[in-house]
């Protein structure tokens, strides 16, 4: 049960109702502070729709954060989003292998992106070696977008956990295929 109410469009001022187009519990809770919700949505919208970073790399990084932090909401939502941009079941299984320190079938760049996401999630910063490995393949713009994407989703999982935002039933199906360790 969420710690703040989920608001419906009729409960908020008309000028903020556009923020509920996605009709997710996250957005319904964030509109308790509509201007903050708009700022949050601006960053999330840029990451998803404005950035020219390879969307598969973006989603692998986000999935890594969600998996590491055992964020059911984040992980399941981004499995669905990731599939829409080319993330395969083999990619998700490879991410799980990489997380456990086992070899995977991923190419070096996606492997390095996952490692960078792990380092930022659990160690605050990406190591020099990982940063250099990724940077050898990405422009300055894409490197900036990647780092800010990982940082943003590290924040998102903390918002989801602190606010105890409930996952929508249609996303729980993902957990049958990819159960999060330690999450029931």
What are these regions (language model features)?
Residues 1-184:
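Hydrophobic alpha-helical segments
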């Amino acid at each position: 049960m969420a710690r703040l109410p989920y608001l419906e469009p009729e409960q908020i001022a008309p000028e903020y109702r556009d923020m509920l187009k996605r009709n997710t519990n996250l957005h319904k809770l964030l509109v308790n502070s509509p201007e903050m919700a708009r700022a949050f949505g601006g960053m999330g919208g840029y990451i998803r729709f404005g950035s020219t970073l390879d969307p598969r790399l973006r989603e692998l990084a986000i999935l890594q954060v969600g998996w590491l932090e055992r964020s059911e909401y984040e992980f399941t939502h981004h499995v669905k989003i990731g599939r829409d941009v080319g993330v395969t079941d083999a990619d998700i299984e490879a991410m799980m292998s990489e997380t456990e320190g086992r070899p995977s079938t991923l190419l070096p760049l996606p492997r390095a992106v996952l490692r960078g996401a792990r380092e930022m999630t659990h160690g605050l910063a990406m190591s020099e070696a990982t940063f250099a490995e990724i940077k050898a393949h990405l422009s300055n713009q894409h490197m900036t977008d990647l780092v800010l994407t990982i940082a943003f989703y590290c924040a998102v999982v903390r918002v989801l956990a602190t606010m105890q935002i409930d996952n929508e039933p249609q996303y729980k199906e993902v957990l049958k295929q990819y159960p999060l360790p330690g999450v029931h």
